[in-house]
A protein has these predicted regions:
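Iron-associated oxidoreductase/ferritin-like identity signal
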Residues: 1-169
Length: 169
């Protein structure tokens, strides 16, 4: 069993992972309205990844014979409607998640739970990848500016992204 402080921190992070899924689902809807199917696909993969991250936490808490505690998932707040604004918010959100995962790791280290530290190492590495992936799309959007043809080409590129179920832990 995990220390109660660590259990609570895992439950808080589980909620944040579910919020991430919810946020990206809302953003996906905006791109669907804009008929940007590549961006829809990119966010669909992101939604699936966030669900997998949440389920990894869920399964880990159960495996450790600890208690799951669910709390409300906040309504997503989307700060802009353009692809650039949305991806700026995605990067900001992923940086927030990285900070949150690091805080969870801090608790695991504080209570000296080596199993949790080992488990969370995957999430730490995953966040590096998440920020890099978002940063790549964001850099392209910044280069594109108001060029609609370039946006269309990026949309065609993003349609090729596929979800690969992660092996967590």
């Amino acid at each position: 069993m995990m220390d109660k402080k660590l259990e609570q921190a895992f439950n808080v992070q589980l909620n944040k992972e579910l919020y991430s899924e919810y946020l990206y689902l809302a953003m996906k809807g905006i791109f669907a309205e804009l008929k940007l199917t590549g961006f829809v696909n990119w966010l669909d993969v992101q939604v699936q990844e966030e669900r997998a991250h949440a389920m990894g936490m869920y399964d880990y808490v159960i495996t450790r014979n600890n208690h799951l505690e669910f709390s409300s998932i906040d309504k997503p707040v989307i700060k802009g409607l353009s692809p650039l604004e949305i991806f700026e918010q995605i990067l900001e959100h992923e940086e927030y998640v990285t900070s949150s995962i690091n805080s969870l790791m801090d608790v695991a280290e504080e209570v000296r739970d080596r199993a949790a530290i080992s488990f969370l190492d995957w999430y730490v590495k995953e966040q590096v990848e998440e920020e890099s992936n978002v940063g790549t799309v964001l850099a392209k959007l910044r280069l594109i500016g108001d060029d609609k043809q370039a946006l269309f080409n990026l949309d065609k590129e993003l349609v090729t992204r596929t979800f690969v179920a992660p092996v967590i832990g």
